[in-house]
Amino acid sequence: MKTGKTLRAFIIATFSLYAIPLFAQKTPSLSDPEIASVALTANQVDVAYAKIAQEKSKDPNILEFAKTMTKDHEGVIAQAEALAQRLSLTPKDNAVSKQLNNDAEETKKTLNAKTDKDFDRAYIDNEVTYHKSVIATVEGVLIPQSKDAELKQFLQQVLPVLKTHLDHATMIQSQLPK
């Protein structure tokens, strides 16, 4: 019974990540401070997932991937914060960033409830889903709605990193037992 509830919660959390781009597209307009908040939040969320993986996984591929996620996303956060400071732009919470945080809390609970190979599978499945969703949101919402040229350029420069993460996660996913 508990496994069924946990799986259901994970599926709901994963599905809700796919809803983020759809939800964001229904947002009439995101200001640059709101876009900055979404970008920062998305990176902070993935760092949180990676830290859970670094604590729980024993799989060398998962551990290396999680270490890369932490390093890369913390680097993006530092760059985003520096850009925001340079542009005198204060990130502003909004429905999309709040939804990201709410979904992340559920996903973290689900990940923390898993162990061993079940954890590894849940983590990497989430990473694939999460990166697909974030890429779709950056391409379909954040870049088109960015007014500031530097912010738009920053988001465009982050996309290849996100796509590399997705490719890496997909490769690891294909190597894990079903």
Model regions and ranges:
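His/Met- and acidic-residue-enriched segments that coordinate or traffic transition-metal cofactors
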Residues: K2-A9, Y18-K178
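Sec-dependent N-terminal signal peptides
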Residues: I12-T14
